[in-house]
Amino acid sequence: MHIAVAVSGGTDSLFALLQVLEAGHQVTALHAHFLSPHDTPETTAHNTQAIEKACRALGADFHVEDLSAAFRKHVIEPFIDAYRQGRTPNPCARCNASMKFGLLADTARKLGAQAIATGHYARLQPDLPRPGNTVSLWRGDDPAKDQSYFLSLVPQHRLACAVFPLGGWRKQDVRAHLKQRGIVPPLPSESQEICFIPGDDYRAYLTAHAAGLPGAGPMVLRDGHVVGHHNGLWQYTEGQRRGLGIAWSEPLYVLEKDVSRNALVVGTRKQLTARGCRCVGVNTLVPPDQWPDAVYVKTRYRQTMIAAQVTPDADGADTMRVIFAASHTPPAAGQVAAVYDAAGRVLAGGIIASVF
């Protein structure tokens, strides 16, 4: 099988390339320029040359594709718009759905590949594409690195052409295997949380790149009592305690962002609860009539799965309503809610639109 392997130059993607090569497939190493030099000084010709050298040394053909304009349109601009609307977006999940398994996968097909492999820590069954087959997405075997949450928005037909060689590996074993083989990744450091934001400082990035962000407004309790002023809703996240600048009899937390009033609603730890959330843009990987009675959700990446009741809304097939089995810390609107069964199979994923 001809498989394109998405390579960034890091440990995980280089190991994925090695695994696919050693399995005997025809391989093209596919490197995407998602960021232009205007977005980051780290995207340089030197890095690309180093990545190409490493890939060719392993015996793979190498191809570079400039997708920076599309990345700005499909990932960066929606990221900025979400903050303008008082939401906390998840650009990595959007990138997986629209870029890595969207436009980059399209590039792979144009190069003659039947599948695209990446360095994600997640599993697919079956593990190799088979014509006409549907696939199921599962949590990776390394609980500390599992990335199925970020993949829950990738459509079924895209996953059907994907390969995840790292799904059954743990990160420390990946590093050890490369070291044993004497293979040094050209960009060996861990990738930052959001690739287009230097130092993961989203506030500095938005200040420099986003016009029209909402300004200061009142900070209020649930009863409407004003206890202070915030510096712009985009600078806060639900559940946040630090940085509120309020002297109160007990610690206060961000309960919600009232965009209509440009008000930041705060309250005590006891008030920091939610019964559920409503999601839009739902990507269904397993038909709901095939779901087990017991399902679970994750509304944050490093969160343990929590029991919930999940049902499609009556107003459309791409929405769903999530009711937590027990009161839960409010998730942030704009984040992903991924639905699982008890064994770790991903059933669906959607964008949190509102919390109640």
Swiss-Prot record:
One of its GO terms (cellular component) is cytoplasm. It is found in: Cytoplasm. CDD domains: MnmA_TRMU-like (cd01998). Disulfide bonds join 95-195. Its EC number is 2.8.1.13. GO terms for molecular function: ATP binding; tRNA binding; tRNA-uridine 2-sulfurtransferase activity. The active site is at residues 95, 195. GO terms for biological process: tRNA wobble position uridine thiolation. ATP binds at residues 6-13, 119. It comes from the Bacteria. Residues 145-147, 300-301 are annotated as: Interaction with tRNA. Keywords: ATP-binding, Cytoplasm, Disulfide bond, Nucleotide-binding, RNA-binding, Transferase, tRNA processing, tRNA-binding. It catalyses: S-sulfanyl-L-cysteinyl-[protein] + uridine(34) in tRNA + AH2 + ATP = 2-thiouridine(34) in tRNA + L-cysteinyl-[protein] + A + AMP + diphosphate + H(+). The record marks 120, 335 as: Interaction with tRNA. InterPro entries: MnmA-like, MnmA-like_C, MnmA-like_central, MnmA-like_central_sf, Rossmann-like_a/b/a_fold. Its main location: cytoplasm. PANTHER family: MITOCHONDRIAL TRNA-SPECIFIC 2-THIOURIDYLASE 1, TRNA 5-METHYLAMINOMETHYL-2-THIOURIDYLATE -METHYLTRANSFERASE. Belongs to the MnmA/TRMU family. Catalyzes the 2-thiolation of uridine at the wobble position (U34) of tRNA, leading to the formation of s(2)U34. This is tRNA-specific 2-thiouridylase MnmA. The gene is mnmA.
